[in-house]
């Protein structure tokens, strides 16, 4: 009886959290996705880099809780991102990343200004990078529900 009661309470908490997550407008970009779709899109991006099998596995592991963002509508202030700079195809590497503190529209393109844990600021041009944004707990909750419904 005790275990059943705990499961009912946890189920109610998860239900309330899911409703709260769905009401959050910042999560609107995730509603048409699923974990499988996110992995497929991420894989398509990484395959374009023509990485070795081991490097590809390593990148997938490092980007497990991230999704690709390729337009301005999905990039959100205060979110943690990592990116791969495409300017030098001979030196492809995944950055440790930073938190988005500003988005700047300039004559030559759109730039994202980030700050890392050492307060170092970095400016990246959206058109020259593959950008991966870390999933929030709310987004993970929505994805879990969408994955369940997809079965």
Please name every model-derived segment:
Residues 10-48:
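Extended boundary segments
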Residues 72-90:
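Short coil-to-beta transition motif at edge beta-strands of beta-rich domains
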């Amino acid at each position: 009886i005790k275990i059943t009661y705990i499961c009912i309470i946890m189920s109610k908490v998860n239900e309330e959290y899911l409703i709260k997550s769905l009401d959050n407008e910042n999560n609107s970009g995730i509603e048409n996705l699923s974990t499988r779709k996110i992995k497929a899109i991420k894989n398509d991006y990484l395959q374009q880099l023509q990485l070795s099998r081991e490097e590809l596995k390593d990148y997938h592991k490092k980007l497990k809780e991230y999704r690709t963002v390729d337009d301005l509508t999905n990039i959100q202030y205060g979110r943690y991102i990592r990116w791969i700079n495409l300017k030098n195809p001979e030196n492809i590497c995944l950055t440790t990343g930073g938190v988005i503190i500003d988005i700047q529209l300039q004559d030559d393109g759109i730039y994202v200004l980030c700050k890392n844990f050492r307060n170092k600021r970095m400016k990246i041009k959206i058109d020259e990078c593959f950008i991966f944004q870390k999933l929030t707990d709310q987004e993970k909750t929505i994805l879990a529900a969408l994955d369940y419904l997809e079965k």
